């Protein structure tokens, strides 16, 4: 998914059919971009309204589809936030278990190199000073040096694909959770016919092991995305 809607009909042969297929693809991309822009905009404005400081951090950086949106909105708000892009930049890895399996998650897909990501961001007006790009395999996230990881986080955008990746992301976030932080999952409802989505399964497991916080559902978006507000118990 990656909030990119699946094509309901394969491209038929012939130039006219090919053109129609391309038009449908462009329409889906526009809907996806609008949904992401809306949720990131709502989240950043809510954080600004509530006075929650901290950075924007995204995990999963395919095609630089979300960080430029965050930068665009960030520029319009009083509370400026540094932008972090953290990914392996190697595409979808091999599945580590059955919860990593999904009909659209194929090993090697969704590949964008770090250089291509940075180039896309510059092209969309994101200055190098506004962002930090971190290249790191997901199993090594907790071993990042202190200058290579964000510590004060306000908004997290989780756009990696596999359950195992999301588990590593959540473990990095565990000691950095705070009252008012927002977490957005791009693939929260990406179920398969056999089991719940990797994002949802990982987040539910994480919630059961987190005593100091609970998570209030905020907004759904697109056809598979969902967001949550982090709340301290009795806050």
Residue ranges and their predicted role:
Residues 8, 12-34, 52-235:
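S-adenosylmethionine/decaboxylated-SAM
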Residues 38-51:
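Conserved alpha-helix/loop element of class I SAM-dependent methyltransferases that forms part
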